[in-house]
Amino acid sequence: MRILVIGSGAREHALLRGLSTDPATTELHVAPGNAGLGSIATVHPGIKADDPEAVTALAKELNSDLVVIGPEIPLVAGVADALRAAGIAVFGPNKDAARIEGSKAFAKDVMAAQGVRTAHAEAITPGASSEDIDAAIDRFGPTWVVKDDGLAAGKGVVVTPDRAAARAHVDAVLEGGNPVLLESFLDGPEVSLFCLVDGETVVPLLPAQDHKRAYDNDEGPNTGGMGAYAPLPWLPEDGVQRIVDEVCVPVAREMVARGCAYSGLLYAGIAWGAEGPAVVEFNCRFGDPETQAVLALLKTPLAVLLNAVATGTLAEQPALEWEDAYALTVVLASYNYPEAPRTGDVIRNADADNVLHAGTALNAEGELVSAGGRVLNVIGVGETLEAARDNAYTTIKDIELEGSHYRSDIALAALEGRISI
């Protein structure tokens, strides 16, 4: 298969690595890519990922058998629709189905129709009076959850015990032109479960846990994700199946009923409380950085699997096979991420096999430099969670990037038995 991957981050690097080991893969291309992907795929840097016409033209030019879309923005922009209209197999949902991430209000409506457990929510639209906003905020708390009802790269959510901070985020989102969703706070540890979905066929991958806050001990602002690990030693034995049965299958069924059948990767962000799983959010694509850990453990050929989803034959595939191990991702972020990341700093000692590229580029001198907030990912795999952590942190400590930072506590709470249900 000739495969084109759309995106430019470490998630796409992980997808390319997985696809490259599948004997069914004959050619790999990526657009727009980054500075670390040239050794594994042909990079097409001039292509805008969210331009349906440009992506479709490239796929036709390359005679692609399969296009795999990594990020959410191209999906919400209708890139998958354009590819399908051109007769090209694509892994990723159509624009209508991508609303499961693009509109939190739409996701709430889908869940309500199927009785899926989630937080109570209330929308505030641009133009609402100050008095109405205050009244809505007073109906929630004392821990406020304020969400930008649009795409925010994982950084549009504020969870705070401070009413003034909650109001400030409401105002900021409304001033940006998007509605706001206020939600009740869901207690319990979070689970990221990726499911391959082909209509009403749902196949779960390994459960993972993301670390959203910028700094150790879950301090600092929300980010796109600073690290993740898989699987979850603290999740009940029936945990994955409960999420599939109580969340993902009902949602897939509802999408079919609404005429926007889902085809691609459905990411369920779950809070596991006293009554079991409740939905925090849905994403319409592989999560970043959880994907990097999950795919490191997948033994089943990835190209064949994604193509089965794209061609409507997922139900015919054999059960997935996994390594009996743990995997962990640690993100190396640039100076002042996530507020105003500095770019252009030279990166050294990043040549290890377990390093994935995200925000990287080459400068005029041909040096590897930072080109985004999340710059590199380091993957650790081991028979135990402790061994996986050791492998990742041994590598990341040697990488040089001025002003960079990373969390030193990825999976530490799980390792020390501090997560309980």
Curated annotation (Swiss-Prot):
GO terms for biological process: 'de novo' IMP biosynthetic process; purine nucleobase biosynthetic process. Binds 1 Mg(2+) or Mn(2+) ion per subunit. Its cofactor is Mg(2+); Mn(2+). Mg(2+) binds at residues 281, 283. It is an enzyme of class 6 (ligase). ATP binds at residues 137-192. Keywords: ATP-binding, Ligase, Magnesium, Manganese, Metal-binding, Nucleotide-binding, Purine biosynthesis. It catalyses: 5-phospho-beta-D-ribosylamine + glycine + ATP = N(1)-(5-phospho-beta-D-ribosyl)glycinamide + ADP + phosphate + H(+). Residues 108-311 form the ATP-grasp domain. NCBIfam families: purD. Belongs to the GARS family. This is Phosphoribosylamine--glycine ligase.
